[in-house]
């Protein structure tokens, strides 16, 4: 397979998990409920804002009249929803699990303060060397793009 001439990488729209993390970063940890922290990462859905974002980028791509040879998406619900909401004509999406983002392990289910207090060394490493930092009990896969469109 030859290398693409152009590679478009599109991140999923805002997800329910993004809302929880953003609220926590602003000091509101009320969304870190037992129901929320037990949702598997792959199952988070888009919010209404996320669907609007996906629709917006989809309309823009269609307006560019760009045709793609391949359309790839991770198996996560939010990425598949983004792909579907973009409504790209003639797109046949291929699920590819290599495109999934890395797991954040147990850190995904705790607040920022809990992370700082319970894993101080790991917190410091994350802040001094974020490119090579890996969460405790997380996958070793690097961060990959969620949705990919290529042209040749």
Regions found by a protein language model. Name each.
Residues 78:
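Cytochrome P450 catalytic-core helices
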Residues 8, 72, 94-96:
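General small-molecule cofactor/ligand-binding pocket signal
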Residues 73-74, 146:
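Short beta-strand scaffold positions
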Residues 1-69, 81-84:
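An N-terminal RHG(E/S)-centered segment typical of histidine phosphatases
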Residues 16, 20-41, 45, 87-150:
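Phosphate-handling substructures
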